[in-house]
Amino acid sequence: DFILAVGGGSVIDSAKAIGYGVANGGDVWDFYSHKRNAAGCLPIGVILTISATGSEMSDSSVITNEDGWIKTGYHSEYCRPKFAIMNPELTMTLPDYQTACGCTDILMHTMERYFTKGENMELTDSIAEALMRTVIENTKILKENPKDYNARAEVMWAGSLSHNGLT
């Protein structure tokens, strides 16, 4: 048994929360409010349809409790997806606005780390700079040609790398 998340970050993160609930029982919000730690997670698989959050490769999830509108995250190696199908063709029907939002999300995740102080960050900063350049260059290409496979592939890969411990 496993959960197949078909979509972007919100869908994937919801699948992770469901996986915690199935594997552990009780109230899922106990994990997200840090009242208890998960002892497992139903395996997650992903078919990515928008490049943005990097959730397809991460051990983190962020969900919103609509009762009080509390947005909070939880991370555990248990919920890192077992596989992610990342086919840029699945993003080609996205409206330009959603593509731009995804590219902006990738940039923000990368800049968040880039502008955080730290020692001995030369390599990490160089990776972040390369990711930002890649996203900016390919966002321009996608504005002119939304069906450009290579630009979508570059953005998809950058999104997965930008929020998964490299930067």
Describe each region flagged by the PLM.
Residues 1-26, 141-152:
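N-terminal small/polar loop signature for handling phosphorylated ligands or for N-terminal nucleophile
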Residues 23-120:
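A glycine/threonine-rich phosphate-anchoring loop and its flanking beta-alpha core
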